[in-house]
Amino acid sequence: MWTVPSFTNDSYQVYNVFSTNSFQLLTVKRTPHEAWRVPLTTKTNKTKGLPDCPKKPTNGPFIVTSILWDNCNAPKAVVLQTLAMGIVIDWAPKGHYWQDCSSKNTLCSEFIYSLDYIEHGWQSYTMRQRVSPYPFKWMDTGIAPPRPKIIHPFFTPEHPELWKLAAALSGIKIWNTTYQLLRTKTKTPTFNITLISEWVIPIRSCVKPPYMLLVGNIIMMPDAQTIECHNCKLFTCIDATFNPTTSILLVRAREGVWIPVSLHRPWESSPSIHIVNEVLKDILKRTKRFIFTLIAVLAGLLAVTATAATAGVAIRSSVQTAHYVEACQKNSSRLWNSQAQIDQKLANQINDLRQSVTWLGDRVMNLQHRMQLQCDWNTSDYCITPYAYNQDQHSWENVSRHLKAWDDNLTLDISQLKEQIFEASQAHLSTVPGSHIFEGITKQLPDFNPFKWLKPVRGSLLLLALLILVCLCCLLLVCRCL
């Protein structure tokens, strides 16, 4: 929750409180028989480079015209979960009302007041009221988004954008909060805090490529490093129409996978090489028709062209300017708030641009890798490289781990495999495609010389003529004797 003071004086205060669904806090009981639970906190792994949040809201009567994020560190970090998958904490402030027992009265028991309301529709009327002889105080007064991060078994960077997914399932609820001191006839004062909400702002949270949202009944098995999801669906946006109890997993499209395959024919880099191979097979069967077939082959080769797929990336950027009314410049504080709003919008746009450029960079790298690889000509959806599969270097167990996206030393092995494939592709690129075939044709061309075919035929004809001549002579002698 976040609170913004609207009006304050000595005995009456008005606040605007904003609440939404977020990450579930890990809570514990301070005593076994106590009904109230408090969040589990820690002071380790504090976020560096951020100031501490203010300890209390700004005092004084004023009207707040804008709400600005101001990233800061709370006095303590809350623990979101401690599971086998890891320990997740958050140093962002978690606003809540707390009964102030600084007077050390033994009858006073500090406990948290949270807004655990149940929705009955978007515009449901909700009211919460607390009356106590002890004052209330607002804890964690900073206005900052949640920034969860994992600290065990490994460290991860903070994720200040994930809270938007949880907020989209419920919307942002606005509470009109009044806190006042009621004077009674007795010497004991009464503190009254009332929260009324009649307005919920529905929002929609979306992700951009290459990310998607996997929604459904998700079961994680950390020991097996496996995630099961039955009847799950992929979305790019979510809102309050989704079941708030469902699981949402942010997934990212992979650059590609490497698996060994077998071909039922020799690997060929272009259709022209395939045509030459088929024609040569036919020529070797009918050698005497080589001259006419070769003319047809040369005519066919003239019609075959090799095309290289190139990709152009254009980044379309639009700059929008906003005109502010002169009332925003009446005083320096409003001018400062306006400038801070502009800075926040620019920061959001820069963040979106950074993600877009990262995605475009990945696409360009994929295209570059695709253009560098020598692929089999008869496959367009995937690439079959000429690099032979070595089972000793890359066993099927490693291939299976790669398909399941398991880390460890497998990433290094896959990188080495890519380098070897690229080296093999560069070696193929250094020679003209099909040069070995044409070298074979050059060596076999003398065998297709028709004059060489006539030499053995000429000798056979002479021998046959001599044999016929001998037979005729013998026949003539026989006739004379008769």
From Swiss-Prot:
It is found in: Virion. GO terms for molecular function: structural molecule activity. The keyword Electron transport does not apply. The chain crosses the membrane at residues 459-479. Primary culture of CD34+, lung, thymus, ileal mucosa, small intestine, and testis. GO terms for cellular component: plasma membrane. It holds the Pfam family GP41. Residues 290-310 are annotated as: Fusion peptide. The record marks R289, F290 as: Cleavage. InterPro entries: GP41-like, HERV-K_env, Retroviral_env_glycoprotein. Specific enzymatic cleavages in vivo yield the mature SU and TM proteins. Keywords: Cell membrane, Cleavage on pair of basic residues, Disulfide bond, ERV, Membrane, Transmembrane, Transmembrane helix, Transposable element, Viral envelope protein, Virion. The surface (SU) and transmembrane (TM) proteins form a heterodimer. SU and TM are attached by noncovalent interactions or by a labile interchain disulfide bond. Belongs to the beta type-B retroviral envelope protein family. HERV class-II K(HML-4) env subfamily. PANTHER family: ENDOGENOUS RETROVIRUS GROUP K MEMBER 113 ENV POLYPROTEIN-RELATED. Retroviral envelope proteins mediate receptor recognition and membrane fusion during early infection. Endogenous envelope proteins may have kept, lost or modified their original function during evolution. SU mediates receptor recognition. This is Endogenous retrovirus group K member 13-1 Env polyprotein. It comes from Homo sapiens.
